[in-house]
Design a protein with these regions (language model features):
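Conserved AMP-binding/adenylate-forming core of the ANL superfamily
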Residues: 4, 13, 21-52, 96, ...
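Conserved AMP-binding A3 loop
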Residues: 33-36, 152-179
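AMP-dependent adenylate-forming
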Residues: 7-9, 107-144, 174, 295-298, ...
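Conserved pre-ATP/AMP-binding loop-to-beta segment of ANL
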Residues: 20, 139-156, 163, 187-193, ...
């Protein structure tokens, strides 16, 4: 790819024109070339235009990983529309909450959910390809004239108020991410990126943009298959994926099954992981399982900063520096500014712990339909108020050493990571407290064989069975947010100011274990 793309659609067109016959998508049953994918995206873009979808309009996509899903995503980029991937496994009440915030002009779904704010189109495996084939050829209209600060997508994460919150990410942030991948990740020769990450999950941004829009082949693995390591390793081998991005929990599962090896994954050249800490002993075993030519890259970045803002190559020196602790988050990438501030929003000394604030072109535009949370998290640089400058308060506690390496030290709130998913524990508490009879709830994590487990303690006005609690959670929360254990208490432990003492609750679950 030669010229620097000005828009995300430009980037895809450059990739398609540079190698039209190169595989863009490799499924188990079929391969789709870049030229074919471009034609389909242009046909869908014409269909979107007929539905009055243009620059700045929202399109919600709740579909599995199919050829048509990727073409829809690209069609949104061509139209300048803001796309939003939704989890097909979401309970209806959660999907309804998200649609209420988005008010999409068009909603495409595999389920029974309805969009009261615009059109709803149902596309399942039996109808999707027929729908695509019936669309007329793409017209001669020009792509929408989008700009760097125009939103590209909205990504929903857990919210502490009980409702999910949608981070709005601009085109310029994603273009910057793509440039970093070209500089730092892309292997020599033909690049084939995995797409294990669910499309509604932050890490998929790396797969779609760092991979496909940079001209690499994408090897999708359906979310349901990602739960079965034997299946997804087989699919990655069949697709000859050589850049593989997943959360540490998935790689640890492969280790337990003795599948994380050069023999099982002979094409792998770069492993990328992030979203949660990689246990030190497991990371050392991972590094030892491959030769030095195979790269391991630890990445860090909140959803609100376009997926990735720092990284670290995991080699012998990185492991030695970490000792018995977690590896460093690496150094901040070019294009980012960062501050580490104390509780008074003043810079800390080198080596001291404080909250990480991130600035630069990759910072998002706020949260959709959520002015309060936007004002709380997206802030003016408190150390320099002369000029307007949007910074993101991560809530992550870090320290920076004299070499510029960042080290994670905890959270300032009750946000946790489970299998790479950001979870606000208060959202689970509020969901449980919505069940008749439950008077108070407190969710915590405890160590489990496959990473942190969610556990919920509660008080109730009468007996409530675990089965009732699980059924209630299934109706309100996505799978990754559902507690695995419940504990009934007469009164939840409290601290001096009357708030629930989560540390004491966590100790009860550790004792119960």
């Amino acid at each position: 790819m030669n010229a620097v793309p000005l828009t995300l659609w430009d980037a895809f067109v450059q990739a398609a024109e540079a190698a039209p016959d190169r595989p863009a998508l490799v499924f188990e049953e079929a391969t789709v070339s870049f030229s074919a994918l471009r034609k389909d995206a242009e046909r869908i873009a014409q269909w979107l235009a007929s539905a009055r979808v243009g620059r700045g309009d929202v399109v919600a996509i709740q579909l599995p990983k199919r050829h048509v899903t990727y073409a829809l995503w690209l069609a949104c980029l061509r139209q300048g529309a803001i796309y939003v991937f939704l989890d097909p496994r979401n309970p209806p009440v959660r999907t309804a909450s998200i649609l209420k915030q988005l008010k999409p002009r068009v909603f495409l779904t595999v389920g029974d959910d309805e969009n009261p704010f615009g059109e709803t189109h149902r596309l399942d495996d039996s109808t999707a390809e027929g729908w695509l084939a019936a669309l007329p050829a793409g017209g001669s209209s020009q792509p929408a004239p989008v700009h760097g600060l125009d939103p590209a997508y909205i990504m929903f994460t857990s919210g502490s108020t009980g409702e999910p919150k949608g981070a709005v990410i601009p085109q310029q942030g994603v273009l910057s991410l793509m440039a970093w991948v070209r500089r730092s990740i892309r292997p020599q020769g033909e690049a084939r990126f995995s797409n294990i990450n669910p499309l509604h999950f932050d890490n998929a941004v790396f797969d779609l943009y760092g991979g496909l829009l940079n001209g690499a082949t994408l090897v999708p693995v359906e979310t349901s298959d990602a739960a079965n390591p034997l299946i997804w390793v087989k699919k990655l081998r069949a697709g000859r994926a050589n850049v593989i991005f997943a959360v540490p929990t998935l790689f640890q599962t492969l280790q337990q099954l003795r599948l994380l090896s050069a023999r099982s994954m002979p094409d792998a050249r770069v492993f990328v992981f992030g979203g949660e800490g990689f246990p030190p002993a497991a990371l050392k075993a991972f590094r030892a399982a491959f030769d030095d030519a195979t790269r391991l890259v630890n990445v860090y970045g909140p959803t609100e900063t376009s997926c990735i803002c720092s990284s670290l190559e995991i080699d012998a020196a990185a492991l030695a520096a970490a000792g018995e602790g977690f590896a460093s988050l690496g150094r901040m990438h070019s294009g980012f500014d960062h501050l580490i501030l104390d509780e008074d929003e003043m810079p800390v000394e080198t080596g001291a712990t404080g909250e990480l604030w991130i600035g630069g072109a990759n910072v998002g535009l706020g949260y959709v339909d959520n002015a309060d949370e936007t004002a709380r998290r997206f802030r003016q640089n408190p150390t320099d108020t002369r000029f307007r400058s949007m910074w993101y308060r991560t809530g992550d506690l870090v320290r920076e050493d004299r070499d510029g390496l960042l080290w994670f030290a905890g959270r300032v709130d009750n946000q946790v990571k489970v299998r790479g998913h950001r979870i606000e524990l208060e959202e689970i508490d509020l969901a449980l407290e919505a069940l008749a009879g439950v008077t108070r709830a407190a969710t915590v994590t405890r160590p489990g064989p496959d990473g942190p487990q969610l556990c919920a303690a509660y008080s109730a006005s009468g007996p409530v069975s675990d089965e009732t609690l699980r059924s209630h959670c299934m109706s309100r929360l996505p799978p990754y947010m559902r507690p695995e254990r419940f504990l009934a208490l007469d009164v939840l432990p409290q601290n001096a100011n009357g708030k629930v003492n989560r540390k004491a609750v966590a100790a009860l679950f550790r004792a119960d274990n």
